[in-house]
């Protein structure tokens, strides 16, 4: 079998998208490499300082043979994978081995970081880090600093364990440690075991014994003159830090004995790490790729939430290195993991945010440190850090961002360090005097009786109209009158009480958070309660403002959809359609027989039985189930949660992000600008493009791709970086930005960002806009911002008064503009309404009577509910859909033109002579 140096290069059409796992070794012809590499001679592939990241290398997934000498293979036997994924093992030549950073690039170009979060590198045959010495006899004279006795405790959750360390000595000579490690009390009782037998024996006896670990001892056993992979000078960008961080940019030694354990963790600041085993018994590793890191963190938080003693209180609790779970629990949760055995003269590389744990199989010595590449910067810039331990590692990323990410630097620094991150604290609730409370309660009852009179008439369908009660009591509430009998108004505020909703948020979501113990009963109760709210669909409800709740506990067979089809397709399907399309049709409502979630058949049927127009049962006669509950085990159903937010409940569909097969709320996928649905009509799954820092792709993406116009409409900062949700304070990618913040704030400031599920809980409104904006979220900061903007707009104009001469734009054929001179004869204060149109424009000078209909649950005298859908007559006499923002005031000027006509206009439609000259010069 040919070695890497004599590999024949094949056309790129044969190159797979990921490393091949078929029979035979994985050679360069199985992986992608550059045109230059393909045309170069085989000898040029091994230049000492080769700058090409994809030059040949040899690796295996453990199931395929490798072309190395028999002696080398005996010293470094292949590890047959025992997990659900594989760790790739690489075999560099001596020439490749000379350039550390370049070889790490090769590993990542070959997908080594995606398989399991770690990779093994077997040092070239004959290489040693100590060429001046033949043995390690000098190690006995070394002193271990603060060796720790390990105790592992069982938790209430079977298969979940907690590790404690107690320093047993201030110092211990290695000679004494070696004697202890090889004694009958501490040595490995079954060194003959292989593969999964090693794992089983370890976890079966995990609670027995208290081994001593000589970890985190400063020092190195490399010869100073060794250049290759010398941990004291790896030459990566981490050396740009101008201060020493013990064990991070310095080297630590690890003296192990059987069963000494390093629990699940990712490296400090999500750095890379390198671990080299000098001598002794192997290390046994478990690893999880960064593609599954979010899901793994959520899973671990769930497992340890059953007992207060072990429940995580820190957002970065896994950095404590105290939590362990069995492989069986990972299998049950569907989290891919891999295993690897590390032997002497072998390196293990861990990648940014790659989780790993392991244990030693006997007395051994390893050394380790951290390093970085430019790819790491995108992890380190928003790494979630431990704040409960004063000794936790923190690296100032300012230098790295300024030097390597100059385009992002200002926005990043302003957000994290310059006061740009919003800390929303609800205002203290004021105590209302008892007499005042009574008068408010009486007024509330009177108003409520008037409103409920509007819903006392039965109708045949959700969209038909009826009338009842006095005209005064139902003024402006035609939408409420149109609802069938049985609806009551539980929340009728003109504007959401954001602070009150935020105060309730933590209590109401405590049992629905996806990082706490699983409680499927609470999810069902939540879904059952939510389905009573009009329009009853768990997806469309996001587009009905939460302060406008109409409740009917008898769910109808159908209701109106609030989300147009193009929002699911995320394409410009309206380009050639009539702007004034008819109202969305009624759509059949389906309720899952298992989790009780209710959805429109076109919002989330998943293509299963019951998605048709005539039945809500499967072809076999079974009651309809949602995609989450369909053809899945009880364990799978209960452990399902959304990958794009932090809350349980609601309509979930399968979601593929890179190679991670997970789940997402339909609503979360609607707002995520990297997500695309498998089908815009009755979506059953979604696919999300992974962050560029992952260097991966999502397989099986639909051929219909997201356009650059859509993806770039709000920028890519929110999708490609992790920011903090203003509501739950969790740090995630893909948070929904407030669209009004984007329009009103400085370019260096980030808008309010939130998970859409959190946003609706605290009163933020979700609305539909024309392509390419799509669905948008509006935060709490804009409840009265239209008044501020109005004042600012008025100040931009010169004051005019009765008697002044002005110029008015007259009506002519576009694009011509004709300005007619006239005199102001009257100025009247007028009440106006502020509305946002679907084309993203905002009008601030419409008259109250320009709104001809609304979907408020109750309104009077032109006071509509904030965020209500309204229909507005524009100057062209056409009717347009819009969202109500508020009421204001303007001065309307009556101008008598020179031809005798009188016209009425607001100030922004008039120009003084100076303003006209400036306009014409443009």
Curated annotation (Swiss-Prot):
A zinc finger (PHD-type) spans 723-783. It is an enzyme of class 1 (oxidoreductase). GO terms for molecular function: histone H3K36 demethylase activity; histone H3K36me/H3K36me2 demethylase activity; histone H3K36me2/H3K36me3 demethylase activity; histone H3K9 demethylase activity; histone H3K9me2/H3K9me3 demethylase activity; zinc ion binding. Residues 87-130 form the JmjN domain. One of its GO terms (biological process) is chromatin remodeling. Binds 1 Fe(2+) ion per subunit. 2-oxoglutarate binds at residues 213, 275, 283, 321. SUPFAM superfamilies: Clavaminate synthase-like. Its cofactor is Fe(2+). Residues 223-388 form the JmjC domain. Residues 1-21, 42-61, 435-475 are annotated as: Disordered. Its EC number is 1.14.11.66, 1.14.11.69. InterPro entries: EPHD, JmjC_dom, JmjN. GO terms for cellular component: chromatin; nucleus. Fe cation binds at residues 265, 267, 356. Disruption phenotype: Increased H3 'Lys-9' and 'Lys-36' trimethylation levels on meiotic chromosomes leading to trigger p53-dependent germline apoptosis. In spr-5 null mutants, suppresses the progressive sterility over generations which is seen in spr-5 mutants. RNAi-mediated knockdown results in extended lifespan. Zn(2+) binds at residues 314, 320, 386, 388. Residues 453-475 have a biased composition (Low complexity). It is found in: Nucleus. SMART domains: JmjC, JmjN. Belongs to the JHDM3 histone demethylase family. Histone demethylase that specifically demethylates 'Lys-9' and 'Lys-36' residues of histone H3, thereby playing a central role in histone code. Demethylation of Lys residue generates formaldehyde and succinate. Involved in the negative regulation of lifespan in a germline-dependent fashion. This is Lysine-specific demethylase 4.
């Amino acid at each position: 079998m040919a070695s890497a140096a004599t590999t024949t290069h094949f056309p790129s059409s044969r190159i797979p998208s990921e490393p091949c796992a078929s029979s035979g070794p994985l050679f360069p012809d199985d992986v992608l490499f550059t045109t230059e590499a393909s045309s170069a001679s085989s000898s040029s592939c091994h230049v000492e300082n080769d700058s090409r990241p994809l030059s040949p290398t040899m690796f295996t997934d453990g199931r395929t043979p490798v072309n190395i000498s028999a002696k080398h293979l005996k010293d470094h036997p292949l590890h047959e994978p025992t997990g659900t994924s594989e760790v790739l093992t690489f075999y560099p030549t001596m020439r490749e081995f000379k350039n550390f950073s370049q070889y790490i690039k090769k590993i990542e170009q070959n997908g080594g970081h995606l398989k399991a979060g770690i990779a093994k590198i077997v040092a070239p045959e004959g290489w040693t880090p100590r060429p001046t010495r033949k043995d390690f006899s000098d190690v006995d004279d070394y002193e271990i600093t603060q060796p720790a006795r390990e105790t592992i405790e069982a938790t209430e959750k079977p298969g979940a364990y907690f590790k404690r360390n107690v320093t047993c000595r201030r110092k211990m000579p290695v000679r004494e440690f070696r004697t202890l490690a090889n004694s009958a009390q501490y040595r490995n009782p079954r060194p003959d075991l292989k593969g999964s037998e090693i794992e089983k024996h370890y976890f079966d006896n995990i609670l027995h014994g208290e081994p001593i670990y000589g970890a985190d001892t400063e020092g190195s056993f490399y010869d100073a003159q060794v250049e290759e992979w010398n941990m004291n000078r790896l030459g990566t960008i981490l050396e740009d830090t101008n201060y020493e961080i013990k064990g991070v940019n310095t080297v630590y030694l690890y003296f192990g004995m059987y069963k000494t354990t390093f629990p699940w963790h990712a490296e400090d600041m999500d750095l890379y790490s390198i671990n080299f085993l000098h001598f002794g018994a192997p290390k046994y590793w478990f690893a999880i790729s960064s593609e599954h890191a979010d899901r793994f963190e959520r899973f671990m938080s769930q497992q340890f939430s059953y007992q207060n003693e072990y429940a995580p209180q820190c957002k970065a609790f896994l950095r404590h290195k105290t939590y362990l779970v069995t492989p069986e629990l990972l299998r049950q949760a569907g989290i891919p993991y891999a295993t690897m055995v590390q032997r002497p003269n072998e390196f293990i590389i861990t990648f940014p945010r790659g989780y790993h744990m392991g244990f030693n199989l006997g007395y051994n010595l390893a050394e380790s440190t951290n390093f970085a590449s430019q790819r790491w910067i995108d992890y380190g810039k928003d790494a979630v850090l431990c704040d409960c331990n004063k000794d936790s590692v923190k690296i100032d990323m300012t230098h790295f961002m300024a030097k390597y990410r100059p385009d992002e630097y200002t926005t990043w620094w302003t957000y994290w360090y310059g006061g740009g991150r919003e800390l929303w604290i609800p205002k203290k609730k004021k105590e209302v005097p008892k007499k005042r409370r009574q008068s408010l309660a009486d007024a509330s009852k009177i108003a409520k009786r008037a409103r409920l009179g509007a819903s006392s008439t039965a109708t045949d369908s959700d969209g038909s109209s009826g009338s009842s009660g006095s005209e005064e009591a139902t003024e402006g509430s035609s939408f409420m009158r149109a609802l069938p009998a049985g609806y009551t108004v539980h929340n009728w505020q003109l504007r959401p009480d954001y602070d009150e909703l935020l105060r309730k948020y933590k209590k109401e979501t405590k049992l629905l958070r996806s990082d706490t113990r699983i409680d499927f009963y609470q999810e069902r109760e939540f879904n059952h309660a939510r389905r009573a709210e009009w329009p009853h669909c768990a997806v469309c409800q996001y587009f009905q403002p939460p302060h406008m709740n109409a409740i009917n506990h008898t769910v109808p067979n159908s209701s109106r959809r609030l989300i147009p089809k193009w929002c699911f397709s995320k394409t410009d399907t309206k380009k050639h359609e009539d702007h004034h399309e008819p109202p969305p049709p009624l759509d059949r409502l389906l309720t899952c027989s298992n989790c009780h979630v209710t959805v429109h058949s076109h919002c989330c049927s998943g293509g299963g039985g019951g998605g048709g127009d005539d039945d809500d049962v499967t072809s076999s006669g079974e009651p309809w189930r949602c995609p989450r509950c369909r053809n899945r085990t009880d364990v799978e159903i209960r452990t399902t949660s959304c990958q794009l937010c932090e809350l349980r409940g609601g309509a979930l569909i399968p979601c593929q992000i890179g190679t991670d097969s997970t789940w997402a709320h339909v609503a979360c996928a609607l707002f995520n600008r990297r997500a695309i649905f498998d089908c815009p009509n009755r979506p059953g799954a979604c696919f999300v493009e992974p962050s560029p820092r992952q260097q991966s792709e999502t397989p099986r993406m639909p051929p219909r791709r997201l356009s650059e116009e859509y993806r770039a409409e709000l920028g890519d900062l929110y999708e490609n970086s992790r920011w903090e949700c203003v509501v739950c304070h969790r740090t995630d990618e893909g948070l929904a930005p407030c669209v009004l913040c984007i329009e009103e704030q400085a370019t260096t400031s980030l808008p309010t960002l939130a998970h859409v599920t959190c946003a609706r809980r605290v009163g933020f409104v979700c609305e539909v806009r024309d392509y390419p904006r799509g669905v948008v979220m509006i935060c709490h900061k804009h409840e009265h911002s239209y008044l501020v903007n109005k004042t600012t707009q008025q100040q931009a104009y010169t004051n005019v008064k009765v008697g002044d001469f002005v110029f008015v734009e007259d009506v002519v054929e576009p694009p011509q503009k004709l300005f007619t001179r006239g005199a102001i004869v009257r100025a009247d204060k007028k009440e106006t309404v502020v509305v946002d149109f679907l084309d993203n424009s905002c009008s601030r000078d419409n008259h109250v009577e320009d709104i001809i209909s609304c979907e408020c649950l109750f309104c009077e005298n032109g006071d509509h509910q904030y965020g209500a859908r309204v229909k507005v007559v524009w100057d062209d006499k056409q009717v347009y859909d819009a969202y109500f923002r508020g009421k204001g005031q303007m001065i309307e000027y009556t101008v008598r033109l020179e031809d005798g006509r009188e016209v009425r206009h607001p100030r922004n439609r008039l120009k003084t002579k100076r303003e006209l000259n400036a306009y014409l010069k443009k």
